[in-house]
C-alpha cells in the first residue's frame, strides 16, 4: 500500500516538474525577448542623457539642464505610477511622450562645435546600438510569435512619441518648426500607409527616406538621432508587411467601422490638404528664372491636377455613400453571420473599388507631375506637404486596390463525411463495432454542423453535405464531384472559388478510401477540375480532416497550371493520455471553423503541445490569382453615373492609359516576389480573400 502511494506521489511530482520545466522554458524565452526590448529602451535613455549632458557642458545653457532634470523627474514619476499604483497606461504614455521630446531636443540642439568630442561620439554609438537592438527585438518577437497583431492606424506609443518630437521642434524658428511638424505628420501618414500594406507603401518609404535629409527640410543638427527616431518608429509597421496575418478588412477596420460623420470629415480634411499642397505648388510661379517653363507647365498640369482631384474627392465621397448603405444593413442584421466585407460584396463594392483604383491612380500621377513641375528644393514646407499628400493618396489607392481584389468573389461548397476510421488488413474501410457507433455519429454530426456553420457564416453557396456510414463508391463520388465542379452562378459564369471538404479514411499516400476497394487520388480530382474549369480562372480549395492529408499538401505544390490549395490536418500520434486526450477526426474541423468564424477566438496554431496541427499547401500559380476586371464600357458607365459631364473626356484617357499597363514591369516583379514568398517563405496564415484563412502550425 505504501509502495503504491509512494509510486503515485512520485509519478505526479514528476509530471508536475516536467510541466513546470516546459512552462519555464517558454516563459524564459518570452522574458528574454522582453528584456531585449528593455535593454534597447535603457540604451536609448542613456544615449539621450549623455547627449544632453554634453550639450549642457559645452554650451553652458541652463535651460538644457532644467529640461534634462525635468525629464528625469517625469520618468521617475512614470516609474512610480507603474510600480506602486499599477497605472500602466498613464505611466507608459508619460514616458513615451518624454522619450519623443528628449530625443527631439537631442536632434535639434546644435552640436557643430563639439562634433568630435569623445562623449558626443559615444552618444552616436549608443544611438546606433539602440537602432540595432530595436530592430533585433522586433524581429525576434515576430519570428517567435509573441506579437498579436490588432487592427490600428497608429499605436499609442507611436502617436505620443511623434507628438513629443513635434513639441521639441518648437525650440526652432516658426518656419523651421512648422516644416518639422508637417514632416512629423508625413511620418505618421507613412506609418499608417505601411501598416495598411498599401500597394505603393514601399516606394513611398524610399521617397521619404531620400527626401528626409534635404537641407530644405530643416533636418536636425544630429542626423544619427533623427535616424534613430525614424527607424525605431518605422521598424514595426515595416516588418508587419510580412508578419501580419490580418486580412484587408481587419487592417482597415479602424477606418471602415468609423462613424459616418468622422468618415465624411476625413474627406473634407483630405480636400483641405490637397488644396494646401496646390497653393504651395503655386509659389513656384514666383520663380522668374525659368518663367517660360514654369508658367505653361503649371497652367497645363495644374488644370489636369484640379480635374483629377475633383474626381478623387468625388470618388471618396461616393465610396462613403456606399459604405453608409452597407453599415445600415450591417447594424440591422448584426445578430446574423453577416460581416461587413460580405455585405460590401453583396452591394457591388468590388466593382466600384476596381474602377476607383484606376481613377485614384490619375490623382497620384497628377500629384507626381505637379510636384516635379513646381519643385521647390528651398521650401521645406512644400516638401513636407508633398510627403503628406503622397501617402494619403497611396492609402486611398491601396484601399481600393485591396478591396477590389478581395471583395465580391462568389463561392460554392460541398462537404463529404465518411465516418469509417477503422480498416481491414487489406486497407478497406469497415464499419465500426456497435459500441462505438453512437460516439462516432455524435462526432460526425458535430463535423457536419461545424462545416455548415462555416458555409453559412462566409455566405458560401452550399451544394450539399453528404454523410455516409457505409462509404461512397467511386462512380457515385465521380458523379457528385463532377456536378459540383460544373456549378455556375445564377447569372451564368462560373463561381470564383470552389470549396471541397472531406473527412474520412485515407491511405498512407493520401488517397481517399472508398467503398468497394476503390480510391480517389489527387491527380484524378485535378483532372476532373481541369475538365470542368477549362479556360476559366476559378480556384479550388480542398479542406481535409483526415489522418493522411500531408501527402496531398506536398503534391499540390507541384501543380503549375491551376489555382488549387489544400488545407490539411496533422494528428499527433504519440500523446500522453494523462495530459491530453488523443486527437480524433473532427478536432481539426472544430478548431479551424472556430478560428475562421469567431474573431475573438483564442486558438493559437503555433502553440506548443497541440495534438492537432494544421498544414497547407498551394499550387505554384496561386499568388497570381485575380478576379474579373471591369471593361472600358464598365468604366464609362461608372463615370456617367458618378461624375459631372465636364470630366467625361477623361474617360477615353483613362481607358487608353489603363490599356497601356504602365506597371507591367512592377506587376511582373511583384508576381515573382509573391511566388518566391509562397514557395520559400510560406506564411503561417494565408488570407484567401473569401473571409476565411488557411493556416499552418
Curated annotation (Swiss-Prot):
Might you name a Gene Ontology BP term for this protein?
A: regulation of ubiquitin-dependent protein catabolic process
Query: What is the protein's known function?
Result: Plays a key role in maintaining the cardiac electrical stability by modulating cell surface expression of SCN5A. May play a role in the modulation of anxiety behavior by regulating GABAergic neuronal system in the nucleus accumbens.
Where in or outside the cell it occurs: the entry states: Nucleus membrane
Transmembrane stretches, by residue range?
36-56, 63-83, 89-109, 172-192, 199-219, 223-243, 265-285, 293-313, 352-372, 380-400, 646-666
Question: In the UniProt record, which is one GO cellular component term?
Answer: transport vesicle
What does the record give under GO molecular function? sodium channel regulator activity
How does the UniProt record describe the way this protein sits in the membrane?
Answer: Multi-pass membrane protein
The record's principal subcellular location, in a coarse class, is nucleus
Q: What is this protein called?
A: Transmembrane protein 168
Sugar-bearing residues? 111, 533, 598
Q: Which family does it belong to?
A: Belongs to the TMEM168 family.
UniProt keywords, alphabetically = Glycoprotein, Membrane, Nucleus, Transmembrane, Transmembrane helix
What up-regulates or down-regulates this gene? Overexpressed in glioblastoma multiforme (GBM) patients.
Amino acid at each position: 500500500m505504501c509502495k503504491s502511494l509512494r509510486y503515485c506521489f512520485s509519478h505526479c511530482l514528476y509530471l508536475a516538474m516536467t510541466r513546470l520545466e516546459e512552462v519555464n522554458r517558454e516563459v524564459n524565452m518570452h522574458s528574454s525577448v522582453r528584456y531585449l526590448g528593455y535593454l534597447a529602451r535603457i540604451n536609448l535613455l542613456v544615449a539621450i542623457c549623455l547627449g544632453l549632458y554634453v550639450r549642457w557642458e559645452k554650451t553652458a545653457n541652463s535651460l538644457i539642464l532644467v529640461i534634462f532634470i525635468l525629464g528625469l523627474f517625469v520618468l521617475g514619476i512614470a516609474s512610480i505610477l507603474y510600480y506602486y499604483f499599477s497605472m500602466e497606461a498613464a505611466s507608459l504614455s508619460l514616458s513615451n511622450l518624454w522619450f519623443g521630446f528628449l530625443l527631439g531636443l537631442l536632434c535639434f540642439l546644435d552640436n557643430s562645435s563639439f562634433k568630435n568630442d569623445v562623449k558626443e561620439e559615444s552618444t552616436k554609438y549608443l544611438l546606433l546600438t539602440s537602432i540595432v537592438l530595436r530592430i533585433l527585438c522586433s524581429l525576434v518577437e515576430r519570428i517567435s510569435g509573441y506579437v498579436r497583431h490588432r487592427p490600428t492606424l497608429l499605436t499609442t506609443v507611436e502617436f505620443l512619441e511623434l507628438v513629443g518630437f513635434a513639441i521639441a521642434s518648437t525650440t526652432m524658428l516658426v518656419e523651421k518648426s512648422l516644416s518639422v511638424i508637417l514632416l512629423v505628420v508625413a511620418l505618421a501618414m507613412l506609418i499608417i500607409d505601411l501598416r495598411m500594406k498599401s500597394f505603393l507603401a514601399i516606394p513611398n518609404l524610399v521617397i521619404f527616406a531620400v527626401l528626409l535629409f534635404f537641407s530644405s527640410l530643416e533636418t536636425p543638427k544630429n542626423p544619427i538621432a533623427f535616424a534613430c527616431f525614424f527607424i525605431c518608429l518605422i521598424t514595426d509597421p515595416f516588418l508587419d508587411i510580412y508578419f501580419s496575418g490580418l486580412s484587408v478588412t481587419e487592417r482597415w477596420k479602424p477606418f471602415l467601422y468609423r462613424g459616418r460623420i468622422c468618415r465624411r470629415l476625413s474627406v473634407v480634411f483630405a480636400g483641405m490638404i490637397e488644396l494646401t499642397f496646390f497653393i504651395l505648388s503655386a509659389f513656384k510661379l514666383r520663380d522668374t528664372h525659368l518663367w517660360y517653363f514654369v508658367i505653361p507647365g503649371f497652367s497645363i498640369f495644374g488644370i489636369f491636377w484640379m480635374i483629377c482631384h475633383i474626381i478623387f474627392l468625388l470618388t471618396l465621397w461616393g465610396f462613403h455613400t456606399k459604405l453608409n448603405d452597407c453599415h445600415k444593413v450591417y447594424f440591422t442584421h448584426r445578430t446574423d453571420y453577416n460581416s461587413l466585407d460580405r455585405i460590401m460584396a453583396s452591394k457591388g463594392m468590388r466593382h466600384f473599388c476596381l474602377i476607383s483604383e484606376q481613377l485614384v491612380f490619375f490623382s497620384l500621377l497628377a500629384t507626381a507631375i505637379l510636384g516635379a513641375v513646381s519643385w521647390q528644393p528651398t521650401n521645406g514646407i512644400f516638401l513636407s506637404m508633398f510627403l503628406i499628400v503622397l501617402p494619403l493618396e497611396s492609402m486611398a489607392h491601396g484601399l481600393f486596390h485591396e478591396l477590389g481584389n478581395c471583395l465580391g468573389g462568389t463561392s460554392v461548397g460541398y462537404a463529404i463525411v465518411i465516418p469509417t476510421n477503422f480498416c481491414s488488413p487489406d486497407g478497406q474501410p469497415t464499419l465500426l463495432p456497435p459500441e462505438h457507433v453512437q460516439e462516432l455519429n455524435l462526432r460526425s454530426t458535430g463535423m457536419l454542423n461545424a462545416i455548415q456553420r462555416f458555409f453559412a457564416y462566409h455566405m458560401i453557396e452550399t451544394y450539399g453535405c453528404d454523410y455516409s456510414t457505409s462509404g461512397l463508391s467511386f462512380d457515385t463520388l465521380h458523379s457528385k464531384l463532377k456536378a459540383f465542379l460544373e456549378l455556375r452562378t445564377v447569372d451564368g459564369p462560373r463561381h470564383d472559388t470552389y470549396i471541397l471538404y472531406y473527412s474520412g479514411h485515407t491511405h498512407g499516400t493520401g488517397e481517399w478510401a472508398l467503398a468497394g476497394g476503390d480510391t480517389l487520388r489527387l491527380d484524378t480530382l485535378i483532372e476532373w477540375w481541369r475538365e470542368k474549369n477549362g479556360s476559366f480562372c476559378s480556384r479550388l480549395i480542398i479542406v481535409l480532416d483526415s489522418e493522411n492529408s500531408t501527402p496531398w499538401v506536398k503534391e499540390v505544390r507541384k501543380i503549375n497550371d491551376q489555382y488549387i490549395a489544400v488545407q490539411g490536418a496533422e494528428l499527433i500520434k504519440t500523446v500522453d493520455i494523462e495530459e491530453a486526450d488523443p486527437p480524433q477526426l473532427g478536432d481539426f474541423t472544430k478548431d479551424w471553423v472556430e478560428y475562421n468564424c469567431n474573431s475573438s477566438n483564442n486558438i493559437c496554431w503555433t502553440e506548443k503541445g497541440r495534438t492537432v496541427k494544421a498544414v497547407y499547401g498551394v499550387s505554384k500559380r496561386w499568388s497570381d490569382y485575380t478576379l474579373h476586371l471591369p471593361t472600358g464600357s464598365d468604366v464609362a458607365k461608372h463615370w456617367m453615373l458618378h461624375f459631372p459631364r465636364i470630366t467625361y473626356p477623361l474617360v477615353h484617357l483613362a481607358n487608353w492609359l489603363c490599356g497601356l499597363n504602365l506597371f507591367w514591369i512592377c506587376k511582373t516583379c511583384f508576381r515573382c516576389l509573391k511566388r518566391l514568398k509562397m514557395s520559400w517563405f510560406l506564411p503561417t496564415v494565408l488570407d484567401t480573400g473569401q473571409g476565411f484563412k488557411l493556416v499552418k502550425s
